[in-house]
A protein has these predicted regions:
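Core subunits and conserved enzymes of cellular information-processing
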Residues: 1-132
Length: 132
């Protein structure tokens, strides 16, 4: 049983990239689907597909690599808030990730979004992870 599904999601993506895999399969949930959509919108993954397997479903993610150097597009996936120590922030408290080059994913009352979207809507929430 997985106690932290977001950390499991990030670890699966990180391990697949370190192993050079093109596609990674992750058990689906609504939160993981939204995080995947954000990764796609920010340009960190090539494409994704949700598959229903008559249980909870799967998310298939096509990972993105640099054409010349074969380096992964995602340099780091860092879990911030965890079950034992939740991290909340108001719009004024959002930290810049890698001097503005990265993105923080935040769970707000308006849904899961990036830190920039949360700041523009003036809502705070739980900082789930940093990606750069």
């Amino acid at each position: 049983m997985v106690t932290d599904p977001i950390a499991d999601y990030l670890t699966r993506v990180r391990n697949a990239q370190m192993a050079g895999h093109r596609i990674v399969e992750i058990p689906a949930s609504n939160l993981k689907k939204r995080i995947t959509e954000i990764l796609y919108d920010q340009g960190y993954i090539l494409k994704y597909k949700f598959e229903d397997d008559n249980k909870q479903g799967l998310i298939k993610i096509a990972l993105k690599y640099d054409a010349q150097s074969k380096e992964p597009a995602i340099k780091s996936l860092e879990r911030v808030s965890r079950p034992g120590l939740r991290q909340y922030a108001s719009p004024a408290e959002f930290k810049r990730v890698k001097n503005g080059l990265g993105v923080a994913i935040v769970s707000t009352s308006q849904g899961v979004m990036t830190d920039k979207q949360a700041k523009s809507q003036n809502v705070g929430g739980e900082v789930l992870c940093y990606i750069y």
